[in-house]
């Protein structure tokens, strides 16, 4: 029987096996759980699914992907040497091995579940030539799928016609319509609900969230997956963790660090907080469409992004 002393509510508004906070890249975990037969509820702060992933160009960096391996373009030893060098001692052999083992499987799962294919990126390839095991035009892949105007589209903005919405839109659709999952939009997760089990250990049993109608409590019998994005729109967290000023962000405006703060509140450790993917941008005050795009969430961008 649950112990209410740690904040377990007397009544649950929703119940599921796996509660997922966010709807960008974390949809991969949501989709995997749903495909395995778990009842999934996705909690999304925005009024549409996809997060920053939907407004991206959809490309991902994955060694040993099936597209490259079909032509024997990659090698596990080379890939391991490369990611070991780039990790620079900030990871573990076990994590690096798991990335190379299960990462390509995740890419194949997305292709099957979201009804898309992957191609070697025709333009952008993120890598450092100076590191051992580096390869060009092999490991950065882009989704090829059906255009989704609802989830957000970045066609042609940076010389590519790929879109993150090729992944997020059909994946979310499959979670709901194929596997019976549920998506709660305009629902902002605020707190992890915990209890003390019979062994005296604190465990997460659900999520408390805020909606326009008030507070809701969502029970998760198996797991809560946090994937609510970064903290690009939280000035206090940027001052705390970033070593240089970060005045602009390409994250959607719902990325305020809630997932990180919720984890901290129940004792989770943090790592690599000062590190982020970024790029140097020269701002021309007279003509700055890119600059404006960085601050525009999908629902407000004049170009429909």
Which residues are covered by each model-predicted region?
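Glycine-rich FAD pyrophosphate-binding loop
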Residues: 35-56
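Glycine-rich loop(s) and the adjacent beta-strand/alpha-helix scaffold that form part
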Residues: 162, 211-289
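Conserved redox-cofactor binding core of oxidoreductases
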Residues: 100-214, 235-236, 283-284
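FAD cofactor-binding and catalytic pocket of flavoenzymes
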Residues: 282-305
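Glycine-rich active-site loop/strand segments that organize a redox cofactor
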Residues: 61-99
């Amino acid at each position: 029987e649950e112990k209410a002393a740690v904040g377990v509510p007397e009544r649950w508004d929703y119940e599921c096996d796996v509660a997922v906070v966010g709807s960008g890249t974390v949809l991969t975990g949501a989709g995997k759980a749903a495909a395995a037969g778990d009842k999934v509820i996705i909690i999304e702060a925005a009024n549409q699914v996809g997060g920053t992933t939907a407004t991206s160009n959809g490309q991902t960096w994955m060694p040993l992907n099936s597209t490259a391996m079909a032509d024997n373009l990659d090698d596990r030893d080379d890939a391991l040497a490369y990611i070991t060098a780039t990790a620079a001692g900030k990871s573990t052999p076990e994590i690096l091995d798991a990335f190379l083992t299960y990462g390509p499987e995740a890419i194949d799962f997305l292709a099957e579940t979201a009804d898309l294919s992957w191609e070697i990126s025709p333009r952008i390839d993120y890598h450092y030539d100076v590191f051992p095991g580096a390869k060009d035009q092999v490991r950065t892949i882009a989704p090829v799928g059906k255009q989704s105007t609802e989830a957000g589209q970045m066609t042609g903005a940076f010389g590519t016609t790929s879109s993150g919405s090729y992944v997020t839109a059909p994946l979310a659709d499959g979670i709901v319509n194929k596997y019976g999952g549920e998506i709660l939009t305009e629902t902002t997760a605020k707190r992890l609900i915990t209890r003390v089990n019979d062994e005296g250990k604190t465990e997460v049993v659900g999520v408390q969230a805020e909606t326009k109608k008030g507070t809701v409590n969502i029970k998760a019998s198996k797991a809560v997956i946090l994937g609510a994005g970064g903290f690009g729109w939280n000035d206090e967290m940027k001052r705390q963790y970033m070593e240089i000023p970060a005045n602009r962000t390409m994250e959607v405006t719902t990325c305020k660090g809630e997932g990180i703060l919720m984890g901290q509140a129940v004792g989770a450790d943090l790592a690599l907080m000062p590190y982020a993917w970024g790029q140097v941008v020269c701002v021309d005050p007279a003509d700055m469409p890119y600059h404006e795009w960085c601050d525009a969430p999908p629902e407000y961008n004049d170009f429909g992004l």
